[in-house]
Swiss-Prot record:
EC annotation from Swiss-Prot or TrEMBL: 4.2.1.2
Protein name, per record: Fumarate hydratase class II
Subunit-structure text: Homotetramer.
Subcellular location, principal: cytoplasm
InterPro entries the record matches: Fum_hydII, Fumarase/histidase_N, Fumarase_C_C, Fumarate_lyase_CS, Fumarate_lyase_fam, Fumarate_lyase_N, L-Aspartase-like
GO biological process annotation, one example: tricarboxylic acid cycle
Length: 467
């Protein structure tokens, strides 16, 4: 490559450490380029929602800085316009910094500062500085964690909660549809007293609804922002009123229930609020694991499994066994749940990395929480639309299991006692007879321990599903 070619492909930028060659068409500048060269680790960049949150902060800060006399009006307006474009996703390709970078997220904060400064400079026709103007009254140490909380709050409230409510509604509809489908209950994967399929689906719907409740309970801590605390939580280099004003502006622009941190030192030195949210995401994942596994068990077969329900056939299940169809959506749910559980372990470890006034694993917290929210939101809708809505109950098969379970002997305890009832159950299993047959053959009715009517009432499997 000739010097002339080099000049066409690159330009020279400067920062406090000296000169840096930057791709000629890049909107970023020196500090971003240093980060690109320092962290060629995963190839994973910030989530789109995270870039948007950073840009919303920059736009709001410019507006408030102008109102408080920190920035000239024309500079602030140019920054606001540039930040709006970044928030809309028009410049995502100019955010190349790897997620695995400096633990404060300074590289990504400077990436935002530099891109917005370049765009604002092009608009204004004179220099807009990434630090002096775009980052005015701010520090990476309050901006970056605030951006994580903004992005996560938006993702939880706008994506995940509606998706979970959608799934809960689908499960609730099936609960009503299957209200009279009696089946064998199972504990320890062994036969137990009867339940209805509707009761089971009602339980699944409740699990999902309670997940929404847990998210709602943690939301106030997630929506607290350390913005305005700057370097260490003291608010150094901010004008009076900046913190409250900039958070109010971000809340207005985003429509999110954002509030100023009650204690800026907690809000920058610790990440407990988002660790709590990650724990709620893990709990939801655990619940979805239980639901997905139950669906797989009940649909197992078609000949040698339980076959109490059918799931929709979505795709061929085997490259060698013709006609085989597998429960692909529940399996995808299980993998998402495993990923979310692993993400939470990462977030917990990263959350413990707060030393004195700053947590230094912020980018990896952001990556894992936002990924967990996205995965759970997508897979919840898929589970509802492509599996739950199409489930069909095999009523006769389910009732047959319920009636053949030795545990239906349980209501006879009050007539013949626990020990005699246990003998009946064991004999029924050994001789492959029904409980009713063994009771009659053993003479309990003839001896007057109970009447035939009482026996029939006690062995009504649907009646057993209620107190």
């Amino acid at each position: 490559m000739t010097d002339e070619d080099d000049k066409q492909n690159y330009r020279v930028e400067h920062d406090s450490m000296g000169e840096v060659r930057v791709p000629a068409d890049a909107k970023w500048r020196a500090q971003t380029q240093r980060a690109v060269e320092n962290f060629p680790i995963s190839g994973q960049r910030l989530e789109r929602a995270h870039i948007e949150a950073l840009a919303r902060i920059k736009g709001a800060a410019a507006k408030v800085n102008a109102e408080l006399g920190v920035l000239d009006k024309d500079v602030a307006e140019a920054i606001q316009e540039a930040a709006a474009e970044v928030a809309e996703g028009r410049w995502d390709e100019h955010f190349p910094v790897d997620v695995f970078q400096t633990g404060s997220g300074t590289s990504s904060n400077m990436n935002a500062n530099e891109v917005i400064a370049t765009l604002a400079t092009e608009r204004l026709g004179r220099d807009v500085h990434p630090n002096d103007h775009v980052n005015a009254s701010q520090s990476s140490n309050d901006v970056f964690p605030s951006s994580i909380h903004i992005a996560a709050t938006a993702a939880v409230t706008r994506d995940l909660v509606p998706a979970l409510e959608h799934l809960a509604a689908a499960l609730g509809r099936k609960s009503e549809e299957f209200a009279d489908v009696v089946k064998a209950g199972r504990t320890h994967l062994m036969d137990a007293t009867p339940v209805t399929l509707g009761q089971e689906f009602g339980g699944y719907a409740a699990q999902v609804r309670y997940g929404v409740e847990r998210l709602a309970a943690s939301l106030p801590r997630l929506a607290e922002l350390p913005l305005g605390g700057t370097a260490v939580g003291t608010g150094i280099n901010t004008p009076p009123g900046f913190s409250a004003a900039v958070i109010a502006e971000v809340a207005r622009v985003t429509g999110l229930p954002l509030t100023e941190a009650r204690d800026h030192f907690e809000a920058q030195g610790a990440r407990d609020g988002i660790v709590e949210t990650s724990g709620q995401l893990r709990t939801i994942a655990v619940g979805l694991t239980k639901i997905a596994n139950d669906l797989r068990w009940m649909a197992s077969g078609p000949r040698t499994g339980l076959s109490e329900i059918s799931l929709p056939d979505l795709q061929p299940g085997s490259s060698i066994m013709p006609g085989k169809v597998n429960p692909v959506i529940p399996e995808a749910v299980l993998m998402v749940a495993a990923q979310v559980t692993g993400n939470d372990a990462t977030v917990a470890a990263a959350g413990a990395a707060g030393n004195f006034e700053l947590n230094v694993m912020l980018p990896v917290i952001a990556k894992n929480v936002l990924e967990s929210v996205r995965l759970l939101a997508h897979v919840s809708r898929l589970l509802a639309d492509r599996t739950v809505d199409g489930i069909v109950a095999h009523r006769d098969r389910a009732r047959e299991y319920a009636e053949s379970s030795p545990s239906v002997v349980t209501p006879l305890n009050k007539y013949i006692g626990y020990e005699e009832a246990a003998k009946v159950a064991k004999k029924a299993l050994a001789e492959r007879q029904t409980i009713r047959q063994v009771v009659l053959e053993s003479g309990y009715v003839d001896r007057g321990d109970l009447t035939l009517e009482q026996l029939d009432e006690a062995l009504d499997v649907l009646r057993m599903t209620h107190p």
